[in-house]
Amino acid sequence: MPGYAGGQTKNPTYEDVSRGDSGHIEVIKIEYSPEQISYEDLLTVFFATHDPTTPDRQGADVGTQYRSAILYTIDEQKLAAEAFIKNLDESGPRVVTELKPLKTFYAAEEYHRNYYSRNASAPYCQIVISPKLEKLKTRFNELLKNSE
């Protein structure tokens, strides 16, 4: 579920978050079953499919709302993420991913939900999202529920 979290503005809109003064990050809320996929696997996919080393930027998208972050819900997630980040830091560029507790998640507006499937031919989807999805399918096919 796409949404916003990590900031101080209550019930933010996309416009609020885009201005950069809400403190929120554009996020995806992931609900998972540890029996089906491990938190370690989720961390592996997360760090492999975006740039965790550049502050306030993902590709051509620039702004505080694009910063890399893990908003954990239990201490075990925090500890696992800290260890994962430590290993990444020791083997490459410094990771700038924020790590903090999730306080409140605000669901994004309806037009952001299933955005890619509804707009797959749009230039942004073709240039930015499609290559990331192909990388995800190629590298992590065994973890994907519906890989076709």
Regions inferred by a protein language model and the residue ranges of each:
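Flexible coil/turn and secondary-structure edge motifs
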Residues: M1-E148
